[in-house]
Amino acid sequence: LIYRPLGFKFTVEAKVCYYQLYLRVYGGKRMRKHVKGNVSWVGYIDWELESFHGDDYSIMNGSSQNAYLIEEEKTVLIDTIWTPHRFDFVENLKKEIDLKKIDFIVANHGECDHSGSLTTIMDEIPDTPIYCTANAVKSIEGQYGKRGWNFNVVKTGDSVDIGNGKKLVFVEMKMLHWPDSMATYMTGDNILFSNDAFGQHFAVEELFNDKADQCLLNKEAIKYYANILTPFSPLLKKKLAEIIGFNLTFDIIAPSHGAIWRENPLQIVEKYAAWAEDYQEDQVTIAYDTMWEGTTKIAHKIAEEIHRQSPDTVVKVFNISKADKNDVMTEVFKSKAIVVGSPTVSNSILSSVAGWLEFLKQLKFKKKRAAAFGCYGWSGESVKVLQAKLEDAGFEVIDENIRSLWNPDDQDFDQIPGLVTSLLK
């Protein structure tokens, strides 16, 4: 914490050691936080997290791994937290409850940021039943080995009584975003433990959406959807329709990352429904990289021309090598069209653009238009390469393009209005 402002970065192992030292010196512990009724949050807020899924997802405002403790006639633990924090998680949980009083554990998802403390807690209570999907058994045993745990496989519509007139109802959420994913609905208190769905990588000490910075909350929610869930939008639409068809009441939606939706919880469901419909706003995103600034000049001229022809259209311009790739992809998600540029290098395009286009392809955007541009000195293949990759990524690529020999001049710039007119049709 002391060295972060000076620019030092730590490995995960170093962060764990540092935090354990902090606990010894200062006696800190993460107390439970009340959610509703007999439900508490017992997770971990990670203010220092900088990336997720390796370095594939940038974390700008911290994150959390949310686990929940239900204490009705039966005591239930909903999910655990990430592996590096597993010992602290279990020790802190012991301060809140006798672990032997836990009647069963619900594993909504087998990924290690949710199941990473299972091995440690099961060492303490090895016979405790674990409720999860059949695919979750495979993913959990695949990661941690076959340990003879007492798995109880559930599917959509299955339920378990937890006393006081309440029960947990399970809903499979296959490919949102793993094959093993599910959500758990608690009757009586009307809480949906949605796991990764409806989450954000966002640290909120106060837990709830109505206590969070609304601008950051909305920014992180759409970033999460755009960069993680977009490929699964068709499945998401079907799953939302299925859940709505259950005619359930939602007082709280409690995801496994970020803020808990307490105030108007259906707002995030409505946003997901809109985002799943091949979402786009009146926006165009220009993404490029450059060698000697010629491609930059074209990018800026295209932005100016879009504004001239369509003043209400939002235009975003990013140098891919300098901008955060997840932020750029969020803007692509919001856009009706994109324009991608690269100079020619080694008969192809810059590696920064090539890698970004591969990520673009993975997200499976639909119903978006695209155009290409770039400078060259000799053979000039970059535009054709860009067009082919954009088509492969599912974009409707227009024929108009800008290929500039050496540095762009007025003759090149004179082609831009035609490109923009075609792009905005």
Segments the model singles out, each with a brief description of its role:
Residues 9, 13-30:
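Short, Lys/Arg-enriched N-terminal segments with co-localized hydrophobic residues
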Residues 204-207, 214-253, 257-260, 301-316, ...:
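FMN-binding flavodoxin-like domain, especially the glycine-rich phosphate-binding loop
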Residues 33-37, 132-181, 235-239:
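Metallo-beta-lactamase
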